[in-house]
Curated annotation (Swiss-Prot):
This is one of the proteins that bind and probably mediate the attachment of the 5S RNA into the large ribosomal subunit, where it forms part of the central protuberance. Disulfide bonds: none annotated. InterPro entries: Rbsml_uL18_euk. GO terms for biological process: ribosomal large subunit assembly; translation. GO terms for cellular component: cytosolic large ribosomal subunit. One of its GO terms (molecular function) is structural constituent of ribosome. Belongs to the universal ribosomal protein uL18 family. Signal peptide: none annotated. The keyword Protease does not apply. Part of the 50S ribosomal subunit. Contacts the 5S and 23S rRNAs. This is Large ribosomal subunit protein uL18. Gene3D superfamilies: 3.30.420.100.
Amino acid sequence: MIMAQNAKHRVPFRRRREGKTDFRQRLGLLLSGKPRLVARKSLNNIIAQLMAYDEKGDIVLVSAHSRELVKMGYKGHCGNLPAAYLTGLLLGKKAVEEGLEEAILDKGLHRATKGAAIFAVLKGALDAGMDIPCGEEIIADEERLNGTHIKQYAELLKEDEEAYKKQFSKYLEKGLNPEDLPEHFEELKGKILNL
């Protein structure tokens, strides 16, 4: 543990020491006065929230979780790019219905890597009708967002039946061939847009 020893040593805030918050970035986002689109990814899930600042703590205005997609009939993995896009689309749809059409992306301590899941959530929210400033070059290609890359990998792996069944066991358990993921994605996208 770091201890302050003299006037020259300054102890960073606890959340900065724990690697959870970049306060300089947070201040810039809060000064915009817009709600923040917060997207976080774990190995198996995507969480997207629209947050507003309050002195007592941030308030969640609208939220969406990739597990909500399963309730809507999604059979794919809840932690991949298509799930991230659909979660963002669901969040955006809910936000527009609540009258929250403007936001700013809060990427937290994540690096801005082209095609990352955070930007797939952002693209989903944009397609739902939200106004969020971003550069188009950072968002993944349409083929990656709809799962075509998973389909291509499944077709490549199908030559080795054992490896195919091991890699896509959850898909097959749920009754979805990985080769049909782009069509399944479009079906669920239409379902979300018609809510």
